[in-house]
Amino acid sequence: MLEFLSQQKPKILIIGDFMVDNYTWCDCSRISPEAPVLVAKTLKEDKRLGGAANVYANLKSLGADVFALGVVGDDKSGKFLQENLKGEFLIQKGRKTPFKNRIMAHNQQVLRLDEEDISEILLENELIALFDEKIKDFKAVVLSDYAKGILTPKVCKAVIKKAKALNIPVLVDPKGSDFSKYSGATLLTPNKKEALEALKFENLEGENLEKGIKKLKEDFSLRYSIITLSEAGIALFNEGLKIAPAKALEVYDVTGAGDSVIAVLAFCLANEIEIFKACELANEAAAVVVSKIGSVSVSFDEIRSFKSMSFEKKIKNKEELLTLLKQNDKKIVFTNGCFDIVHFGHIKYLEKAKRLGDVLIVGLNSDASVKRLKGESRPVNSEFQRACMLAAFYFVDFVVIFDEDTPLELISFLKPDILVKGADYKDKLVVGSNLISRVELIDFEEGFSTSKIIEKIKDKK
C-alpha cells in the first residue's frame, strides 16, 4: 500500500484556521534578581506552519497537490502564510492572523504567547463562493477547525453540502462541543476530550466507547465515525467498532499529531483506500510525528522507515532507559519476570499493566538469573529471544534485562511510579514495594503457566 500511495498525487483542498507556529529557543540557566522567575536567553527563532497550515504541510510532504482556502489578516503572519502556501486567501483588514509563540528551553515548552482574533469572519459569503468555484477539481476536502472563527456554521454547512453533491469526501478535524455544523461529513476526527464534550458522556471506557462512537455516526450522519485515543490508538466505527492500536515507541511532543492523522486519512480516502487500513497508516504517521519536537510534517519515506524499524529498539539497558524517562513527564509502570515461554496469561497480564500508566517497562531476568531461580534446564528461550518477544507487543514500551535474582536494584535505579505484580503476591512482600508509593496486584488468567506448558510438551514426547 505504501508503494502505491507514494506514487499518487491527489488534489486535496483545505479550508480552516491557518496559523503560524513560532518557536523561540532559549537557554534558561539562572533566576532573575528582580523576581523568582527564570531568565531566558534567546538562542534562535523558528517559524513554522501551524493549524490548518500544518495539515497542508503534511499533505504536501506525503506528495499531494494541496490547495489552501482561508481568511487571514493584513499582518506579518498573514503574509507569511500567503508566501508559503499555494492557495487563495481573502484578506480581512484589522484581523489578527493566529500566531502562537512557544518559548522552549532544554527541549521543553515553558510558555506560549498567543496573538489571535477568534471572532467569526466577516467574509463568509466570499469564502463560500471561492470554494464553489474551486471544488470540482479536487479528490478530497479537509476542514481543519481550531475555533478561530473561519469555519462558521454557515461555511461548514455550505462546504459539506456542495462536496457531498459532487461525491467528494469531506474530513473534519472538529473543535468545540457542538458538532452539528459538521453534519453530513464523511468523517470527523475528534480526540477523546472533544468527543466527551460533544457526547456529554462522563467517560469513554468499556461499552461507553462503542455507544459513543456509534452515537456520533448516527447523530451527525457520518459515513465513518472516528475517535483518536492518544496512546491507545484510533477507534473506528463503520459496521462495528474496531481499534487500530497506537504505534509510538518514544513520545517527545504531541503537537501536530492530530494534523498528521487527518492528513493521512484524507490522502488515503482521496485514493479510495479502505478506511481501517487508512487508520492504521494514520497511527504510524502520528508515531513518527510525536517522536519529534514541534509541529512537523511526515512523509511516506519516514513512515516506511518507522515500519521497518526493529522492535529490538525497545530493548534498553538501564542507563539508556533512565535518560529516555527523564525527557518525558510520564507515569511509569514497572513489572518483571522470566517470561520464558510467553503465553496468553502473560499477554493479558501485561496488557492490564499498561493500562495503569503511560509507559510500561518490563524487567526481564537474564539467562543466568533464570538458571539460578528455575534450575539448569531453564530458560527454554535465551534472554535476547525472550526480550524480542516481549518487545514485539505494542503495549510493552521497553524491556530491560537484569542479572540479579530480584529487580530491587533496577527498581531503585529507575524509580517507576507504579510497581505491578501478580495477584499471587497478595500475602507476600513485593520486592521494591518499600521504594514505590503505589503497588498494584493483577489477577492472572487461570490455567496458564510456563511450567504447565513445558510439562505438556514433555508428556507428548
From Swiss-Prot:
CDD domains: RfaE_like. Keywords: ATP-binding, Carbohydrate metabolism, Kinase, Multifunctional enzyme, Nucleotide-binding, Nucleotidyltransferase, Transferase. Pathway: Nucleotide-sugar biosynthesis; ADP-L-glycero-beta-D-manno-heptose biosynthesis; ADP-L-glycero-beta-D-manno-heptose from D-glycero-beta-D-manno-heptose 7-phosphate: step 1/4; Nucleotide-sugar biosynthesis; ADP-L-glycero-beta-D-manno-heptose biosynthesis; ADP-L-glycero-beta-D-manno-heptose from D-glycero-beta-D-manno-heptose 7-phosphate: step 3/4. The keyword Kinase applies. Residues 334-461 are annotated as: Cytidylyltransferase. The active site is at residue 259. It catalyses: D-glycero-beta-D-manno-heptose 7-phosphate + ATP = D-glycero-beta-D-manno-heptose 1,7-bisphosphate + ADP + H(+); D-glycero-beta-D-manno-heptose 1-phosphate + ATP + H(+) = ADP-D-glycero-beta-D-manno-heptose + diphosphate. ATP binds at residues 191-194. InterPro entries: Bifunc_HldE, Cyt_trans-like, PfkB_dom, RfaE_dom_I, RfaE_dom_II, Ribokinase-like, Rossmann-like_a/b/a_fold. Gene3D superfamilies: 3.40.1190.20, HUPs (3.40.50.620). GO terms for molecular function: ATP binding; heptose 7-phosphate kinase activity; heptose-1-phosphate adenylyltransferase activity; phosphotransferase activity, alcohol group as acceptor. It is an enzyme of class 2 (transferase). It comes from the Bacteria. Catalyzes the ADP transfer from ATP to D-glycero-beta-D-manno-heptose 1-phosphate, yielding ADP-D-glycero-beta-D-manno-heptose. In the N-terminal section; belongs to the carbohydrate kinase PfkB family. In the C-terminal section; belongs to the cytidylyltransferase family. PANTHER family: BIFUNCTIONAL PROTEIN HLDE (PTHR46969:SF1). This is Bifunctional protein HldE. The gene is hldE.
